[in-house]
Curated annotation (Swiss-Prot):
This is Large ribosomal subunit protein uL5. Pfam families: Ribosomal_L5, Ribosomal_L5_C. Keywords: Ribonucleoprotein, Ribosomal protein, RNA-binding, rRNA-binding, tRNA-binding. PANTHER family: 60S RIBOSOMAL PROTEIN L11-RELATED (PTHR11994). GO terms for cellular component: ribonucleoprotein complex; ribosome. Belongs to the universal ribosomal protein uL5 family. It comes from Synechococcus sp. (strain WH7803). Disulfide bonds: none annotated.
Length: 179
């Protein structure tokens, strides 16, 4: 059963009851997932940008947008319009497919994994997770990468509070660390 189907058939009714909501439309749901990668020092290197774009495209299955510097910062040696990272926004079917792969395949492959931090909510029910290495995703082959790079994954939900967001992600199978 796909994550979207499981959400509709089991998670939504359970959250409706657990959070004591009166309407199905009040139940929190995932709106979008944003995968972002800043290049840092590698911003000077065009090859690393290309590798980053290709890796994110493989992981997400969607075209990647190159993010550019809004203004020049001499201390970081960047000029306005220079590529400084890349990002992908996933919605709909691709979003659910990515979340399913993240929760069931990628996260368990992290070394010494004890669960993700339950404190990384932003106060409005959205969750952000930092991944240190891209090789946890099965789409990336270890032999073909030139450097280990991380990424930020933000899960945007309609939850009003962190507790609602946590309940939603826990039901979806997100392995939260027990403190």
């Amino acid at each position: 059963m796909s994550l979207k189907q499981r959400y509709r058939e089991t998670i939504q009714p359970k959250l409706l009851k657990d959070l004591s909501l009166s309407n199905v439309h009040e139940v929190p749901k995932v709106v979008k997932v944003t995968v972002n990668r800043g290049l840092g020092e590698a911003a000077q290197n065009a090859k690393s940008l290309e590798a980053s774009v290709n890796e994110l495209a493989q992981i997400t299955g969607q075209k990647v947008v190159v993010t550019r510097a809004k203004k020049a910062i001499a201390g970081f040696k960047i000029r306005q319009g220079m590529p400084i990272g890349c990002a992908v926004t996933l919605r709909g079917e691709r979003m659910y497919a990515f979340l399913e792969r993240l929760i069931n395949l990628a996260l368990p492959r992290i070394r010494d994994f004890r669960g993700v931090s339950p404190k990384s909510f932003d106060g409005r029910g959205n969750y952000t997770l930092g991944v240190r290495e891209q090789i946890i995703f099965p789409e990336i082959s270890f032999d073909k990468i030139d450097a280990i790079r991380g990424m930020d994954i933000t899960i945007v939900t309609t939850a009003r509070t962190d507790e609602e967001g946590r309940a939603l992600l826990r039901e979806m199978g997100m392995p939260f660390r027990s403190n």
